[in-house]
């Protein structure tokens, strides 16, 4: 694919970017020296309690996606395509094209049963040798094992693939997101049918795999009428982190990245898997990147801890909290604050976060900070300490020095977190772009359309030319 010549017209695409707490539809505008985003629609996303467990309000989510796309087309009639990225691991089950039930939320408690049943059949060490995936209790293969309705399904689609199907009628599994399921062979990068059979997971429901940049299909007539244009849907790096890493302006192999939102995904890019006892014990994962590289990374709890704490305080106060003011007060806290294990399993569920963090602090021998500013600072320093530990592990396990950390996503706006990460890692942090995920989504679409150059290095060079990161130097 060739890039647009100098002086070429700016092109436009629509990016659907879905996170665990909110979703957005954005217009991306791309040219030789242009890479811009315009927010068209933002809407909440989250779990709902049902008699069957914790599920996503998927009908509302999809309706908001369609409305957002229609609004984008009205605002920018020259939009040429649609790309969709979302969080990993969760899925919908179809039978004869109909969604059997709203998708389960990855924090639903049924996953613990799935873990026990999977590991009883295939030990984790054997799983890791086949899929290279870190242990997370909500990985898709554990969810499939715990889901009684897989036997009724003819197709299982991860969230971005499910939305693409509802828009186009085309069923496919985008490869970067498929690599997070635990059912993709880390060597062949295809479905591990033997593993699925060993786990009692119906392999017939696993759809054909496509690579990022594939044109999945055009909108169905009904969707084209609702959205207002007959557009193709292009498979991007549909795992949001895969899209984010496309837009990390790394220029050398000694750079690491942190994609920070609800989660912090900390890692480096490598060409071949590192399937050692050390990487397994460090819980490092191998997820596929947009152009076939491996995102060698570790999941760290991110801003979830702070956002859940603020949510609890707002419920207690009956009023919104001024987050910038809270962060300013946190940055002004004088003296050390206690640092706790941000990845403590007791902090993974929603609700009562300040109480549960206080319990973790006491259990780890710390006094609970006095006042909300100090409490928030303790949370931020604990997240930064977890980031720094993961950076050190990435360097040791990959065998390469880390001289720069690129921190992208919503966390790049948190100056306290960026500085604390630099301080605790001893490595300079370059913060931004904040919208790396949507930018990566847009870039892959644009490349398929022939609007930008074809290599990952050239795509990142465009990010560098159009977005200036903020540098945080480690303090002694």
Residue ranges and their predicted role:
Residues 169-178:
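Enzymes and membrane/adaptor proteins characterized by extended Gly/Ser/Thr/Asp/Glu-rich
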Residues 2-3, 14-15, 119-131, 142-158, ...:
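Active-site core segments that coordinate phosphate-bearing ligands/cofactors
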Residues 78-86, 155-156, 208, 397-409:
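Short glycine-rich phosphate-binding loop at a beta-alpha junction
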Residues 1-101, 224-234, 425-427:
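N-terminal glycine/serine-rich phosphate-binding loop of ATP-dependent small-molecule kinases
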Residues 70-139:
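Active-site phosphate-binding/coordination module
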Residues 24, 66-81, 137-145, 151-164:
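Conserved phosphate-binding loops in N-terminal lobes of ATP-dependent enzymes
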